[in-house]
Amino acid sequence: MSRHESRKLSDDYEVVDVLGKGGFSVVRRGISKSRGKNNDVAIKTLRRYGYTLPGAQRSQPGQRGLSPLGMPTLKQVSVSDALLTNEILVMRRIVEDVSPHPNVIHLHDVYEDANGVHLVLELCSGGELFDRIVAQDRYSESEAAEVVQQIASGLAALHKSTIIHRDLKPENCLFLNQEKRSTLKIMDFGLSSVEDFTDPIVALFGSIDYVSPEALSQRQVSSASDMWSLGVILYILLSGCPPFHAPSNREKQQRILAGDFSFEEHTWKTITSSAKDLISSLLSVDPYKRPTANDLLKHPWVIGDSAKQELIEPEVVSRLRSFNARRKLRAAAIASVLSSKVLLRTKKLKNLLGSHDMKSEELENLRAHFKRICANGDNATLPEFEEVLKAMKMNSLIPLAPRVFDLFDNNRDGTIDMREILCGLSNLRNSQGDDALQLCFQMYDADRSGCISKEELASMLRALPEDCVPADITEPGKLDEIFDQMDANSDGVVTFDEFKAAMQRDSSLQDVVLSSLRTI
C-alpha cells in the first residue's frame, strides 16, 4: 500500500455512483481511466478515525501481494480502525494465497489518503444471493445445491489459507454479473481472521441468525464456524425461514446453543433426505462433527447426484421474499447506528462544548436556521454550519466548529446531517417524560409526517454516550431486538404512538432512548 502522494486514487479511477454503505465504509463504482468503461471496479473506502496507517508500500496493479503493515494492536484503536486494519490484513493474505479464485472477491489495488484506505475490488454487479433467488418465481434443490457448491469452493480456498470468514451470510455473497450462470463471490472480510495472525473481532456485528454456538459462547472459533453459517444459509434456501425461531433474542441464542431446530414444517416433506442430512451435519453443535468445505465438494447432494430437479414449493419462495425484505431493512438500520462511532462521539462532543447547555428553544431555533441556510436540505457544509452558529449568536462555539463538524462527517464527504447534530447537542440538556420522547421523535421526523423510518430511528441512537449504552449493545442481535420492539406492526416505520407504547412496555428501552436527552 503506497504512501506516495504522487499517486492518488483519482489519478487512476473516476469514482462515480455509490453502490452501498456499511457501518464504517462506503462502496462506490469506479471506472479505470486507463482501461475504460469495460473495466469497472468497486472501490471500498474504509474510514479511519483514530490513527494513520504507518508507511507501507502499495503493490502496483497486477502484482500479487501487499507489503507487511506494522499495525498497532486492535485494543489501541477504535472499532472502526480495528475493522479497517483487520480487513486489510485479511485481504493481503487473500491476494497472496487465494487470488485469483472464481468464488472469492479479488483485490486489484490499494490506495491511502486523508479520507481513509481505498480497496479497489472486483465489481460484482449481479446482486446479493437472496435477491437473485427471490427474483425467480420458483427454484429447485438442484439450483440451491449449485449455490452451496460455489460457497463451499470459496470457503475451501480460504480455509486452506487459514482464513476464517466469521460473518458468512447471504448479503456477503454476490453474483459477479447478471448472467444466469454467473459465479458467486464471497466478500466482506471486515470480521474475518487469519488463524495465528490477526486478532479476531469477536461478536460485534454478526447477525445472530448465522452465528455458531461456539462464537456465541465465546469459545474457540474455527473454519467449522463458517460451515455452521453455510448450514443456516442452506436451511433458509430450502424453507424460506431461519432454523432457530424464537420470540426474543435471548431465547434464540439458547436455541442456537442447543442446536434446537427441526424439519417439522410441512414444506420439508418435499425436500430430499440427503439435503436434510447435510443440514443436520452442518448444524451440529459440536464443530468437530461438521463437514469441511472440501467434504461438501464431494457430497452427493452438493454435486447434484441426489438433489431434486423439481421446483420447490411456492410458499418457500414467498417466505424467503418476506425474510429477505426484513433482513435488508434491519441491515440498513443497523449500519446507520454503527456508522456513528457509538462509543466515542458523544464524549468527544461534550469535551468540545464543555458546559454549554442547549435549551429546547435553542434546538428548535437551530433546526430553523439549518433549514434556512443549508442549500442541500438537511445536510450542511462546514461554511454553512459556521453560518448557522453565527446566526444563533453562538460565537464561543465558532472556533470549535471544524472539530464538531468532523465528529459528524461520517463518510468524509464534507457534509453533516442536521438531524444528527441536533440529537448530539441534545445530549447536553436534561429532559424527561413525554416531552423528552416527543423531542426525540421530532428531531428525526424531518418532514413532519408523524412517523419515522427505521433508518431514522437507528440514527436517533447514534448520539448515545458510552456511559448510557447498554452493556450488551454490541452482542449479536441486540440492536435487532430494539428495532423489533419499536416497530410493533412491522411496517418499516414507527409512529409516535408506537414509539411511546414501546417505551411504556419496556422501561429498559426507555432508558436507552432517553439517554440521548440526558446530561452525561
Curated annotation (Swiss-Prot):
Autophosphorylation stimulated by calcium and inhibited by calcium/calmodulin. Occurs probably by an intermolecular mechanism. Ca(2+) 1 binds at D409, N411, D413, T415, E420. It is a single-pass membrane protein. The chain crosses the membrane at residues 227-243. It is an enzyme of class 2 (transferase). Changing S453A: Decreased calcium binding. PROSITE patterns: EF_HAND_1, EF_HAND_2, PROTEIN_KINASE_ATP, PROTEIN_KINASE_DOM, PROTEIN_KINASE_ST. The modification Phosphothreonine is found at T267. Protein kinase that may be involved in microsporogenesis. Belongs to the protein kinase superfamily. CAMK Ser/Thr protein kinase family. CaMK subfamily. This is Calcium and calcium/calmodulin-dependent serine/threonine-protein kinase.
